[in-house]
């Protein structure tokens, strides 16, 4: 995977592949356990990738609006799932000879704002038809999708597509402040999207990888809207708790900020000015210095008892 992007070491110990020529840092994540043969859609695997992203953004000068997620074979399966679970983190998704399975089929609408470049071979065990459920939905709804199918080719890495990939990547950039978004989630760790965090999913929405699939489970739908004209953030969530994060590119901190949850206005302190402590904590935890949040609001929705309340009640019994 690393050499595919960067080329091999030359006698002087340098790599002069396409990534270096185009100004990219390439990170290869060791997310598999010993003897693991396939992607397992687990929290451990998500954390392996997201922790590396956080580590890199803290230690290097990274353009966080130009981060791409890619993988070959099982790594492509992982990239597809993690990309759709956290579409706000990436400028684009590049699954190669991969399968969109399990949660990808239920999270397909999360990719509305995520450019995807899918590469496969026509002789790779009907891979295009196996992914047709997801790909056809992307295409039908006008998502930013590129499919490169190589006729007469099978299960291989397709290094001859690399130059076209870099040309495609050069034209993509993440929009971290969309005016509207709608996503679905079924795992407790798929709980943050752009400027909204959620907590306590409805019981009939939670499906862990070991349980998948569960008949009757319905993904939790989260929709949000940024309305600068009236200095308002609006969300509709089925969860027990929601956290708004507010940055300087979103609203006017000199004016009162309005927060609406499920159609109801949330009472907020009069002082919604930037808070240095929140800013520093956000940069520390996310590592995104280009898109910092200056203020946040946490509120209960009343739909479900949060885990924190249950814990306090249990300790009091």
Residue spans for each PLM region:
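Short beta-strand/loop motif that positions the catalytic acidic residue
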Residues: 111, 117-120
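Alpha/beta-hydrolase-fold serine-hydrolase catalytic core, especially in secreted/extracellular enzymes
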Residues: 140-146, 151-317
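Primarily recognizes the serine-hydrolase "nucleophile elbow" in alpha/beta-hydrolase
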Residues: 65-112
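Short alpha-helix in the alpha/beta-hydrolase fold that links the catalytic acid
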Residues: 7-9, 127-137, 245-248
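Active-site machinery of serine-nucleophile hydrolases
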Residues: 1-58
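Extracellular/periplasmic catalytic domains that process cell-envelope and extracellular macromolecules
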Residues: 17-22, 61-62, 85, 109-112, ...
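Stable alpha-helical elements in mature extracytoplasmic
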Residues: 45-52, 75-82, 86, 130-134, ...
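Acidic catalytic loop of the alpha/beta-hydrolase fold
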Residues: 122-128, 155
């Amino acid at each position: 995977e690393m050499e595919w992007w960067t080329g091999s070491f030359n006698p002087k110990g340098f790599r002069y592949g396409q990534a270096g020529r185009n100004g990219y840092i390439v990170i290869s994540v060791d997310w598999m356990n010993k003897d693991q043969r396939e992607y397992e859609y687990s929290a451990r695997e998500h954390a392996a990738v997201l922790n590396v992203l956080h580590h890199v953004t803290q230690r290097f000068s990274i353009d966080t609006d130009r981060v791409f997620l890619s993988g070959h074979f099982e790594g492509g399966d992982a990239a597809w799932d993690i990309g759709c679970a956290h579409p706000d983190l990436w400028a684009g998704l590049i699954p190669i000879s991969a399968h969109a399975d399990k949660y990808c089929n239920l999270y397909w609408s999360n990719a509305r704002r995520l450019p995807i470049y899918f590469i496969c071979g026509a002789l790779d065990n009907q891979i295009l038809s196996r992914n047709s459920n997801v790909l056809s939905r992307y295409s039908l709804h006008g998502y930013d999708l590129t499919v490169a199918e190589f006729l007469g080719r099978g299960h291989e890495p397709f290094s001859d597509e690399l130059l076209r990939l870099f040309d495609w990547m050069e034209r993509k950039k993440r929009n971290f402040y969309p005016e509207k978004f709608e996503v679905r989630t079924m795992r407790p760790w798929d709980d943050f999207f752009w400027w909204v965090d959620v907590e306590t999913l409805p019981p009939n929405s939670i499906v862990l990888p070991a349980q998948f699939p569960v008949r009757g489970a319905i993904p939790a739908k989260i929709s949000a809207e940024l309305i600068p004209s009236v200095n308002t953030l609006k969300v509709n969530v089925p969860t027990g708790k929601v956290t708004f994060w507010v940055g300087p590119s979103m609203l006017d901190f000199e004016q009162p900020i309005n927060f609406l949850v499920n159609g109801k206005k949330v009472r907020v302190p009069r002082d919604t000015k930037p808070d240095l402590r929140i800013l520093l904590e956000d940069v520390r935890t996310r590592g995104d210095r280009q898109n910092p949040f200056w203020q946040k609001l946490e509120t209960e929705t009343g739909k479900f008892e949060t885990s924190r309340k249950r814990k306090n009640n249990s300790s009091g019994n």
